[in-house]
Amino acid sequence: MADPQAFCVAEERSGHCAVVDGHFLYVWGGYVSIEDNEVYLPNDEMWTYDIDSGLWKMHLMEGELPPSMSGSCGACIHGRLYVFGGYDDKGYSNRLYFVNLRTRDGTYTWEKITKFDGQPPTPRDKLSCWVYKDRLIYFGGYGYRRHSELQECFDVHDASWEEQIFWGWHNDVHVFDTKTRTWSQPEIKGGVPPQPRAAHSCAVLGNKGYVFGGRVLQTRMNDLHYLNLDTWVWSGRISVNGESPKHRSWHTLTAITDDKLFLFGGLNADNIPLSDGWIHNITTNCWKQLRHLPYTRPRLWHTACLGKENEIMVFGGSKDNLLFLDTGHCNDLLIFQTQPYSLLRSCLDCIGKNAIILKSQISLLPPKLLQQVLKKITFWTAANYRKEQRIRKEETENNQPRVSSC
Protein backbone atom coordinates (compact mmCIF):
# COMPACT_ATOMS: atom_id res chain seq x y z
CA MET A 1 0.00 0.00 0.00
CA ALA A 2 1.54 3.32 -1.07
CA ASP A 3 2.02 5.95 1.60
CA PRO A 4 0.06 9.05 0.49
CA GLN A 5 2.24 11.28 2.68
CA ALA A 6 5.42 10.07 0.97
CA PHE A 7 3.96 10.82 -2.45
CA CYS A 8 2.58 14.28 -1.65
CA VAL A 9 2.67 16.92 -4.38
CA ALA A 10 3.01 20.70 -4.32
CA GLU A 11 -0.35 22.48 -4.25
CA GLU A 12 -2.15 23.50 -7.42
CA ARG A 13 -1.11 26.94 -8.64
CA SER A 14 -0.70 29.33 -11.54
CA GLY A 15 1.53 32.34 -12.04
CA HIS A 16 4.31 30.83 -9.92
CA CYS A 17 8.11 30.66 -10.32
CA ALA A 18 10.08 27.49 -11.03
CA VAL A 19 13.74 26.78 -11.79
CA VAL A 20 15.97 23.71 -12.06
CA ASP A 21 19.31 23.59 -10.27
CA GLY A 22 21.24 20.34 -10.12
CA HIS A 23 18.95 17.38 -9.46
CA PHE A 24 16.02 19.45 -8.21
CA LEU A 25 13.10 21.48 -9.51
CA TYR A 26 12.23 24.40 -7.19
CA VAL A 27 8.74 25.93 -7.07
CA TRP A 28 7.67 29.10 -5.25
CA GLY A 29 4.68 31.43 -5.19
CA GLY A 30 1.67 31.73 -7.45
CA TYR A 31 -2.00 31.63 -6.61
CA VAL A 32 -4.98 29.27 -6.61
CA SER A 33 -8.76 29.73 -6.66
CA ILE A 34 -10.72 28.70 -3.56
CA GLU A 35 -14.49 29.18 -3.66
CA ASP A 36 -14.19 31.86 -6.37
CA ASN A 37 -11.51 33.72 -4.42
CA GLU A 38 -7.94 34.17 -5.63
CA VAL A 39 -5.64 33.00 -2.84
CA TYR A 40 -1.87 33.49 -2.98
CA LEU A 41 0.28 30.53 -1.96
CA PRO A 42 2.30 30.99 1.27
CA ASN A 43 5.42 33.10 0.77
CA ASP A 44 7.38 31.08 3.36
CA GLU A 45 7.01 27.78 1.51
CA MET A 46 9.17 26.39 -1.27
CA TRP A 47 8.62 22.98 -2.84
CA THR A 48 11.45 20.86 -4.22
CA TYR A 49 11.04 18.00 -6.67
CA ASP A 50 13.81 15.38 -6.79
CA ILE A 51 14.19 14.67 -10.50
CA ASP A 52 15.73 11.24 -9.85
CA SER A 53 13.31 9.87 -7.23
CA GLY A 54 10.19 11.79 -8.28
CA LEU A 55 9.47 12.90 -4.70
CA TRP A 56 8.22 16.31 -3.62
CA LYS A 57 9.16 18.00 -0.35
CA MET A 58 7.99 21.26 1.23
CA HIS A 59 10.52 23.54 2.94
CA LEU A 60 9.75 26.45 5.27
CA MET A 61 11.76 29.55 4.39
CA GLU A 62 13.32 32.24 6.54
CA GLY A 63 14.75 35.73 6.14
CA GLU A 64 13.31 38.79 4.37
CA LEU A 65 10.36 37.06 2.75
CA PRO A 66 8.89 38.40 -0.50
CA PRO A 67 5.14 39.06 -0.36
CA SER A 68 2.90 36.23 -1.55
CA MET A 69 2.62 37.04 -5.26
CA SER A 70 1.71 35.84 -8.73
CA GLY A 71 3.23 36.90 -12.04
CA SER A 72 6.72 37.31 -10.59
CA CYS A 73 9.74 36.53 -12.74
CA GLY A 74 12.06 33.82 -11.38
CA ALA A 75 15.55 33.01 -12.68
CA CYS A 76 18.53 31.04 -11.40
CA ILE A 77 22.20 32.07 -11.50
CA HIS A 78 24.89 29.93 -9.80
CA GLY A 79 22.41 28.25 -7.48
CA ARG A 80 20.60 31.44 -6.50
CA LEU A 81 16.91 31.92 -7.27
CA TYR A 82 16.16 35.57 -8.06
CA VAL A 83 12.53 36.75 -7.97
CA PHE A 84 11.57 40.14 -9.39
CA GLY A 85 8.26 41.95 -9.74
CA GLY A 86 4.84 40.38 -9.50
CA TYR A 87 1.43 41.29 -8.16
CA ASP A 88 0.17 40.99 -4.58
CA ASP A 89 -2.68 42.32 -2.45
CA LYS A 90 -1.05 45.76 -2.45
CA GLY A 91 -0.51 45.98 -6.21
CA TYR A 92 2.46 45.67 -8.54
CA SER A 93 6.03 45.19 -7.30
CA ASN A 94 9.48 46.17 -8.54
CA ARG A 95 11.41 44.61 -5.68
CA LEU A 96 14.14 42.00 -6.17
CA TYR A 97 14.80 39.08 -3.80
CA PHE A 98 17.09 36.07 -3.91
CA VAL A 99 17.59 32.80 -2.03
CA ASN A 100 20.57 30.44 -2.06
CA LEU A 101 19.36 27.01 -3.22
CA ARG A 102 22.66 25.23 -2.49
CA THR A 103 22.60 25.31 1.29
CA ARG A 104 24.37 22.57 3.21
CA ASP A 105 21.81 22.33 6.00
CA GLY A 106 18.68 22.53 3.85
CA THR A 107 17.72 25.96 5.21
CA TYR A 108 16.46 28.44 2.64
CA THR A 109 16.78 32.12 3.60
CA TRP A 110 15.44 34.98 1.50
CA GLU A 111 17.34 38.24 1.13
CA LYS A 112 15.77 41.44 -0.18
CA ILE A 113 18.20 43.43 -2.32
CA THR A 114 17.94 46.96 -0.98
CA LYS A 115 21.47 48.23 -1.58
CA PHE A 116 22.06 48.64 -5.30
CA ASP A 117 23.14 51.22 -7.85
CA GLY A 118 20.97 52.45 -10.69
CA GLN A 119 17.23 52.56 -11.19
CA PRO A 120 15.08 49.39 -11.23
CA PRO A 121 12.20 48.93 -13.69
CA THR A 122 8.81 50.39 -12.79
CA PRO A 123 6.46 47.99 -10.92
CA ARG A 124 5.02 45.23 -13.13
CA ASP A 125 4.10 41.56 -13.48
CA LYS A 126 3.97 38.96 -16.27
CA LEU A 127 7.38 40.05 -17.57
CA SER A 128 10.21 37.84 -18.84
CA CYS A 129 13.89 37.38 -18.03
CA TRP A 130 16.98 36.29 -19.94
CA VAL A 131 20.00 35.06 -17.98
CA TYR A 132 23.28 36.01 -19.67
CA LYS A 133 26.82 36.53 -18.29
CA ASP A 134 25.74 36.73 -14.63
CA ARG A 135 23.11 39.30 -15.54
CA LEU A 136 19.34 39.26 -15.30
CA ILE A 137 17.86 40.96 -18.37
CA TYR A 138 14.17 41.81 -18.04
CA PHE A 139 11.78 42.60 -20.87
CA GLY A 140 8.18 43.81 -21.04
CA GLY A 141 5.37 43.11 -18.59
CA TYR A 142 2.20 44.82 -17.41
CA GLY A 143 2.27 47.50 -14.72
CA TYR A 144 2.07 51.20 -14.10
CA ARG A 145 4.01 54.40 -14.65
CA ARG A 146 3.55 57.93 -13.47
CA HIS A 147 2.83 60.66 -16.01
CA SER A 148 6.43 61.88 -15.86
CA GLU A 149 7.66 58.35 -16.72
CA LEU A 150 5.59 57.82 -19.89
CA GLN A 151 7.69 56.83 -22.91
CA GLU A 152 7.26 55.21 -26.31
CA CYS A 153 8.00 51.82 -24.71
CA PHE A 154 4.60 51.87 -22.97
CA ASP A 155 1.05 51.24 -24.28
CA VAL A 156 -1.58 52.76 -21.98
CA HIS A 157 -4.49 50.58 -20.90
CA ASP A 158 -6.06 52.60 -18.08
CA ALA A 159 -5.35 55.78 -16.13
CA SER A 160 -6.01 57.55 -12.85
CA TRP A 161 -5.83 61.22 -13.79
CA GLU A 162 -6.22 62.29 -10.18
CA GLU A 163 -3.06 60.42 -9.15
CA GLN A 164 -1.39 60.80 -12.57
CA ILE A 165 -0.82 57.03 -12.79
CA PHE A 166 -1.14 55.03 -16.01
CA TRP A 167 -1.44 51.25 -16.34
CA GLY A 168 -0.33 49.39 -19.44
CA TRP A 169 2.15 47.19 -21.29
CA HIS A 170 5.93 47.65 -21.58
CA ASN A 171 8.63 46.73 -24.10
CA ASP A 172 11.62 48.23 -22.30
CA VAL A 173 14.78 46.32 -21.36
CA HIS A 174 16.43 46.48 -17.93
CA VAL A 175 19.59 44.74 -16.71
CA PHE A 176 20.60 43.73 -13.20
CA ASP A 177 24.25 42.74 -12.75
CA THR A 178 24.29 40.17 -9.93
CA LYS A 179 28.01 40.70 -9.25
CA THR A 180 27.97 44.48 -8.87
CA ARG A 181 24.30 44.76 -7.82
CA THR A 182 23.73 47.45 -10.41
CA TRP A 183 20.58 48.24 -12.39
CA SER A 184 20.94 49.72 -15.87
CA GLN A 185 18.79 50.34 -18.92
CA PRO A 186 20.87 49.65 -22.04
CA GLU A 187 20.62 51.90 -25.05
CA ILE A 188 19.03 49.93 -27.88
CA LYS A 189 21.43 50.40 -30.80
CA GLY A 190 19.20 49.36 -33.67
CA GLY A 191 16.49 47.17 -35.12
CA VAL A 192 12.74 47.28 -34.58
CA PRO A 193 11.70 46.31 -31.03
CA PRO A 194 8.64 44.15 -30.39
CA GLN A 195 5.37 45.82 -29.44
CA PRO A 196 4.83 46.33 -25.72
CA ARG A 197 3.45 43.11 -24.22
CA ALA A 198 2.95 40.91 -21.19
CA ALA A 199 2.37 37.20 -20.58
CA HIS A 200 4.84 36.47 -23.40
CA SER A 201 7.66 33.92 -23.30
CA CYS A 202 11.41 34.16 -23.65
CA ALA A 203 14.54 32.00 -23.88
CA VAL A 204 18.28 32.44 -24.50
CA LEU A 205 20.28 30.75 -27.26
CA GLY A 206 23.91 31.84 -27.37
CA ASN A 207 23.97 35.62 -27.10
CA LYS A 208 20.41 36.08 -28.36
CA GLY A 209 17.36 36.58 -26.19
CA TYR A 210 14.23 35.31 -27.96
CA VAL A 211 10.67 36.56 -27.39
CA PHE A 212 7.49 34.93 -28.64
CA GLY A 213 3.85 36.03 -28.46
CA GLY A 214 2.13 37.66 -25.53
CA ARG A 215 -0.71 40.13 -25.22
CA VAL A 216 -1.20 43.89 -25.63
CA LEU A 217 -4.68 45.43 -25.26
CA GLN A 218 -7.07 42.79 -26.67
CA THR A 219 -4.53 41.34 -29.11
CA ARG A 220 -2.57 38.12 -28.65
CA MET A 221 0.45 37.69 -30.87
CA ASN A 222 2.54 34.95 -32.50
CA ASP A 223 5.56 37.00 -33.55
CA LEU A 224 9.14 35.88 -32.89
CA HIS A 225 11.97 38.34 -32.17
CA TYR A 226 15.43 38.24 -30.67
CA LEU A 227 17.64 40.80 -28.99
CA ASN A 228 21.42 40.54 -29.36
CA LEU A 229 22.51 40.66 -25.72
CA ASP A 230 26.00 41.92 -26.61
CA THR A 231 25.18 44.65 -29.14
CA TRP A 232 21.61 45.51 -27.99
CA VAL A 233 20.22 45.32 -31.53
CA TRP A 234 16.73 43.94 -32.10
CA SER A 235 16.14 41.53 -34.97
CA GLY A 236 12.72 42.87 -35.89
CA ARG A 237 9.95 40.36 -36.50
CA ILE A 238 11.52 37.14 -37.79
CA SER A 239 9.89 35.78 -40.94
CA VAL A 240 9.75 32.01 -40.48
CA ASN A 241 9.43 29.32 -43.12
CA GLY A 242 6.20 27.32 -43.15
CA GLU A 243 3.57 26.97 -40.44
CA SER A 244 3.78 28.86 -37.14
CA PRO A 245 2.12 28.40 -33.73
CA LYS A 246 -1.17 30.21 -33.15
CA HIS A 247 -1.38 33.60 -31.47
CA ARG A 248 -1.19 33.16 -27.70
CA SER A 249 -0.25 34.43 -24.25
CA TRP A 250 0.58 32.72 -20.94
CA HIS A 251 2.68 30.07 -22.75
CA THR A 252 6.31 29.00 -22.24
CA LEU A 253 9.43 28.98 -24.41
CA THR A 254 12.42 26.85 -23.40
CA ALA A 255 15.86 26.40 -24.99
CA ILE A 256 16.44 22.64 -25.42
CA THR A 257 19.65 22.58 -27.52
CA ASP A 258 22.08 25.13 -28.92
CA ASP A 259 19.75 25.80 -31.86
CA LYS A 260 16.24 24.74 -30.80
CA LEU A 261 13.41 26.26 -28.77
CA PHE A 262 10.41 24.40 -27.33
CA LEU A 263 7.06 26.22 -27.08
CA PHE A 264 4.13 24.83 -25.10
CA GLY A 265 0.55 25.73 -24.23
CA GLY A 266 -0.96 29.12 -23.50
CA LEU A 267 -4.27 30.85 -24.22
CA ASN A 268 -5.13 31.55 -27.85
CA ALA A 269 -6.89 34.50 -29.48
CA ASP A 270 -10.27 32.78 -29.00
CA ASN A 271 -9.63 32.39 -25.24
CA ILE A 272 -9.15 28.62 -25.59
CA PRO A 273 -6.46 26.93 -23.45
CA LEU A 274 -3.84 25.20 -25.60
CA SER A 275 -1.99 21.90 -25.26
CA ASP A 276 0.15 22.02 -28.38
CA GLY A 277 3.93 21.86 -28.45
CA TRP A 278 6.29 23.22 -31.11
CA ILE A 279 10.02 23.16 -31.76
CA HIS A 280 11.69 26.07 -33.55
CA ASN A 281 15.00 25.42 -35.28
CA ILE A 282 16.91 28.70 -35.58
CA THR A 283 19.23 27.19 -38.21
CA THR A 284 16.43 26.32 -40.66
CA ASN A 285 14.12 29.03 -39.30
CA CYS A 286 11.21 26.57 -39.18
CA TRP A 287 8.58 25.61 -36.61
CA LYS A 288 7.62 21.96 -36.26
CA GLN A 289 4.56 20.86 -34.29
CA LEU A 290 4.98 17.80 -32.07
CA ARG A 291 2.21 15.29 -32.72
CA HIS A 292 2.80 12.95 -29.76
CA LEU A 293 1.83 15.32 -26.93
CA PRO A 294 -1.30 14.71 -24.79
CA TYR A 295 -3.84 17.10 -26.30
CA THR A 296 -6.31 16.52 -23.44
CA ARG A 297 -4.10 18.35 -20.92
CA PRO A 298 -3.91 22.05 -21.83
CA ARG A 299 -1.91 24.46 -19.70
CA LEU A 300 -1.57 28.22 -19.38
CA TRP A 301 0.41 30.40 -16.96
CA HIS A 302 2.47 27.31 -16.10
CA THR A 303 6.25 26.95 -15.87
CA ALA A 304 8.54 24.86 -18.09
CA CYS A 305 12.09 23.93 -17.07
CA LEU A 306 14.79 21.90 -18.82
CA GLY A 307 15.85 18.70 -17.04
CA LYS A 308 19.19 16.89 -16.98
CA GLU A 309 18.50 14.90 -20.14
CA ASN A 310 16.79 17.63 -22.15
CA GLU A 311 13.32 16.70 -20.96
CA ILE A 312 10.86 19.56 -20.42
CA MET A 313 9.19 19.61 -17.00
CA VAL A 314 5.92 21.54 -17.07
CA PHE A 315 4.42 22.24 -13.65
CA GLY A 316 1.20 23.88 -12.53
CA GLY A 317 -0.78 26.36 -14.54
CA SER A 318 -4.46 26.26 -15.39
CA LYS A 319 -6.47 24.07 -17.76
CA ASP A 320 -9.24 26.69 -17.92
CA ASN A 321 -9.48 30.22 -19.28
CA LEU A 322 -8.32 32.25 -16.28
CA LEU A 323 -10.24 35.29 -17.50
CA PHE A 324 -13.65 33.61 -17.23
CA LEU A 325 -13.47 30.26 -15.40
CA ASP A 326 -10.68 30.41 -12.85
CA THR A 327 -10.99 26.98 -11.24
CA GLY A 328 -8.82 24.53 -13.13
CA HIS A 329 -5.42 25.04 -11.50
CA CYS A 330 -3.13 22.01 -11.78
CA ASN A 331 -0.37 20.38 -9.75
CA ASP A 332 0.60 17.47 -11.94
CA LEU A 333 4.03 17.46 -13.56
CA LEU A 334 4.07 16.93 -17.32
CA ILE A 335 7.37 15.62 -18.67
CA PHE A 336 8.04 15.94 -22.40
CA GLN A 337 10.96 14.03 -23.88
CA THR A 338 12.61 16.04 -26.66
CA GLN A 339 15.39 13.59 -27.55
CA PRO A 340 16.24 9.92 -26.84
CA TYR A 341 17.32 9.22 -23.27
CA SER A 342 20.80 7.88 -22.55
CA LEU A 343 21.23 4.10 -22.41
CA LEU A 344 21.72 4.27 -18.63
CA ARG A 345 18.51 6.27 -18.17
CA SER A 346 16.56 3.84 -20.37
CA CYS A 347 17.86 0.86 -18.39
CA LEU A 348 17.05 2.51 -15.06
CA ASP A 349 13.51 3.24 -16.24
CA CYS A 350 13.08 -0.36 -17.39
CA ILE A 351 14.21 -1.71 -14.02
CA GLY A 352 12.07 0.80 -12.15
CA LYS A 353 8.94 -0.20 -14.06
CA ASN A 354 9.62 -3.92 -13.55
CA ALA A 355 10.97 -3.87 -9.99
CA ILE A 356 8.67 -6.66 -8.78
CA ILE A 357 9.84 -9.06 -11.48
CA LEU A 358 13.53 -8.15 -10.97
CA LYS A 359 13.40 -8.00 -7.17
CA SER A 360 15.79 -10.90 -6.54
CA GLN A 361 18.43 -9.56 -8.96
CA ILE A 362 18.37 -5.89 -7.91
CA SER A 363 20.19 -6.52 -4.63
CA LEU A 364 23.17 -7.93 -6.57
CA LEU A 365 23.95 -4.60 -8.23
CA PRO A 366 27.06 -2.56 -7.28
CA PRO A 367 26.31 0.00 -4.50
CA LYS A 368 26.53 3.11 -6.71
CA LEU A 369 24.26 1.64 -9.37
CA LEU A 370 21.93 0.20 -6.74
CA GLN A 371 21.35 3.67 -5.32
CA GLN A 372 20.29 4.96 -8.74
CA VAL A 373 18.01 1.96 -9.27
CA LEU A 374 16.30 2.41 -5.91
CA LYS A 375 15.60 6.06 -6.72
CA LYS A 376 14.12 5.08 -10.06
CA ILE A 377 11.93 2.44 -8.39
CA THR A 378 10.64 5.17 -6.08
CA PHE A 379 10.10 7.41 -9.10
CA TRP A 380 7.84 4.92 -10.89
CA THR A 381 6.03 3.87 -7.73
CA ALA A 382 5.19 7.51 -7.04
CA ALA A 383 4.23 8.14 -10.68
CA ASN A 384 1.86 5.16 -10.76
CA TYR A 385 0.27 6.16 -7.44
CA ARG A 386 -0.34 9.74 -8.62
CA LYS A 387 -1.74 8.50 -11.93
CA GLU A 388 -4.24 6.30 -10.09
CA GLN A 389 -5.24 9.21 -7.85
CA ARG A 390 -5.69 11.51 -10.84
CA ILE A 391 -7.87 8.95 -12.66
CA ARG A 392 -10.05 8.51 -9.58
CA LYS A 393 -10.41 12.26 -9.20
CA GLU A 394 -11.37 12.68 -12.86
CA GLU A 395 -13.90 9.84 -12.61
CA THR A 396 -15.44 11.44 -9.52
CA GLU A 397 -15.68 14.82 -11.24
CA ASN A 398 -17.22 13.28 -14.36
CA ASN A 399 -19.83 11.41 -12.30
CA GLN A 400 -21.01 14.49 -10.42
CA PRO A 401 -24.51 15.63 -11.49
CA ARG A 402 -24.50 18.76 -13.61
CA VAL A 403 -26.88 21.63 -12.83
CA SER A 404 -28.61 22.89 -15.94
CA SER A 405 -29.75 26.49 -16.25
CA CYS A 406 -33.30 27.28 -17.38
From Swiss-Prot:
The answer to whether keyword Repeat applies is yes
Kelch repeat boundaries on the chain: 24-76, 80-134, 135-181, 208-258, 260-307, 311-361
Q: What GO terms describe the biological role, i.e. biological process, of this protein?
A: protein ubiquitination; ubiquitin-dependent protein catabolic process via the C-end degron rule pathway
Q: Which UniProt keywords apply?
A: Cytoplasm, Kelch repeat, Repeat, Ubl conjugation pathway
Pathway(s) served: Protein modification; protein ubiquitination
Question: Which is a Gene Ontology cellular component entry for this protein?
Answer: cytoplasm
Where in the cell is the protein located? Cytoplasm, Cytosol
InterPro entries according to UniProt? Gal_Oxase/kelch_b-propeller, Kelch-typ_b-propeller
- The principal location of this protein is cytoplasm
Q: Name one GO molecular function term.
A: ubiquitin-like ligase-substrate adaptor activity
Question: Could you describe the subunit structure of this protein?
Answer: Component of a CRL5 E3 ubiquitin-protein ligase complex, also named ECS (Elongin BC-CUL2/5-SOCS-box protein) complex, composed of CUL5, Elongin BC (ELOB and ELOC), RBX1 and substrate-specific adapter KLHDC1.
- Annotated function: Substrate-recognition component of a Cul5-RING (CRL5) E3 ubiquitin-protein ligase complex of the DesCEND (destruction via C-end degrons) pathway, which recognizes a C-degron located at the extreme C terminus of target proteins, leading to their ubiquitination and degradation. The C-degron recognized by the DesCEND pathway is usually a motif of less than ten residues and can be present in full-length proteins, truncated proteins or proteolytically cleaved forms.
Protein name (Swiss-Prot/TrEMBL): Kelch domain-containing protein 1
